[in-house]
Design a protein with these regions (language model features):
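Bacterial N-terminal signal peptides that target proteins for export
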Residues: 1-9
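Hydrophobic h-region of N-terminal signal peptides that target proteins for export
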Residues: 13-21
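N-terminal secretory targeting signals
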Residues: 22-26, 138
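Active-site catalytic motif of lipid deacylating hydrolases and related acyltransferases
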Residues: 25-126, 263, 287-288, 292-333
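Hydrophobic/aromatic beta-strand patches that form the interior of the parallel beta-sheet core
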Residues: 64, 93-95, 189, 219-223, ...
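Short, highly selective alpha-helical patches that border small-molecule cofactor pockets
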Residues: 75-79, 138, 234
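Serine-dependent carboxylesterase/thioesterase catalytic core
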Residues: 89, 107-220, 225-231
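C-terminal catalytic-base region of ester-bond hydrolases, centering on the histidine
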Residues: 199-334
Length: 334
């Protein structure tokens, strides 16, 4: 079953001409009954059984997991956590090297163009999750898409690692051409991203923008540690704020959490007790406390559960929008 599901979400890559090609989409065929079951899901309340039996039948948006500047711990363990929770591995895989993590030493403009490339072909905007400097890159991508660093962004083919020499795509939801500029990322999460490293690394252009989240994010969650010398926090954490319509949340992590080891969450999905807690978690609602003698280390439980809640929510929303848009345009989901 797992192999069949993974095969169902493989990408059909279509070459695009200078003016943009018709989106090829994912090689996924859903019957009408399955589509109706997906459309009936409540994105804010997806149970483990609904994810396993219904949502897993749908294609999943790509997730770009951006690691920190010193990858003593990459984002691969966090990606493995999401795979263990039920997210398709292919949607987390870096096409450049087949790994489950992305370097944060990347041109954010190129990454913005890559998101557009995927959206045009798959009909679903990727999500961004960044740790430390990776979080800065995720926020920089949002500002790139908002036009803060230029008035156009070229489409970038991640498989060829080359530009397509165009700054417009064919929007798969409307069939019309549109610029890359202004595309909206459905969900962005950043972990322990601070201003001190921006100073030390000479990333001056992001100092004034690091805590400002533009409209190019639909939903953004910033996770911070109050005591985090690496990020430059000494007893308090600066908050992120929307400069438009983005829905922005700030989450302070427990003192037991560590800047470097925040991506280490896989064991939380493998332990029955912590997995059940994560599956019941919903931001702002009471969840029973776990005993401190629970087998896995609980330091990373809060952000793992919070991110997983948002990932499955936006997986559902993107899948539902894909179905609706293709029905409207009378294009089979294939």
């Amino acid at each position: 079953m797992v192999a069949a599901r993974r095969a169902a979400v493989m990408v059909l890559v279509a070459s695009a001409c200078a003016t943009g090609a018709q989106a090829a989409g994912r090689e996924t065929t859903l019957d009408g009954a399955t589509e109706e079951r997906i459309l009936a899901l409540d994105p804010n309340n997806i149970s483990a059984s609904e994810l396993r039996d219904v949502l897993a039948q749908a294609p999943a948006p790509r997730i770009v997991d951006l690691q920190g500047s010193v990858p003593l711990v990459t984002m691969a363990p966090f990606a493995e956590f999401m795979v263990a929770m039920g997210y398709p591995r292919e949607s987390l895989t870096n096409p450049a090297d087949g790994s489950l993590t992305y370097s944060s030493f990347v041109d954010a403009r190129k990454l913005a163009g890559t998101l557009a490339w995927y959206y045009e072909r798959e009909g679903m905007m990727p999500m961004l999750i960044g740790h430390s400097q990776g979080g800065m890159i995720a926020i920089r991508v949002l500002h790139e898409l908002a036009g803060d660093f230029g008035d156009s962004i070229p489409v970038w083919d991640p498989l060829r690692d080359a530009t397509e020499e165009r700054s417009v795509i064919v929007d798969p939801r409307t069939g019309l051409q549109r610029p890359v500029l202004g595309l909206q990322v459905p969900y962005v999460a950043v972990l322990a991203t601070g201003t001190l490293p921006r100073l030390l690394l000479g990333q001056w252009s992001m100092l004034s923008r690091l805590r400002e989240i533009p409209d190019t994010a639909a939903e953004f969650t910033g996770f911070s540690l109050e005591w985090d010398p690496i990020a430059g926090n000494f007893g308090s954490a600066d908050t992120y704020r929307a400069i438009g319509s983005a829905r922005v949340r700030n989450v302070v992590l427990p003192r037991t959490a560590s800047h470097i080891t925040l991506p280490l969450a896989q064991e939380l999905a493998l332990d029955p007790v912590t997995r059940a807690w994560i599956e019941r978690y919903s931001p702002g609602t009471a969840v029973p406390e776990l005993s401190s003698d629970t087998n896995p280390n609980l330091a990373n439980l809060l952000h793992a559960a919070d991110i997983w809640y948002s990932v499955k929510k936006h997986w559902c929303l993107e899948a539902q929008e894909l179905i609706r848009s293709r029905r409207t345009r009378a294009v089979p989901l294939q």
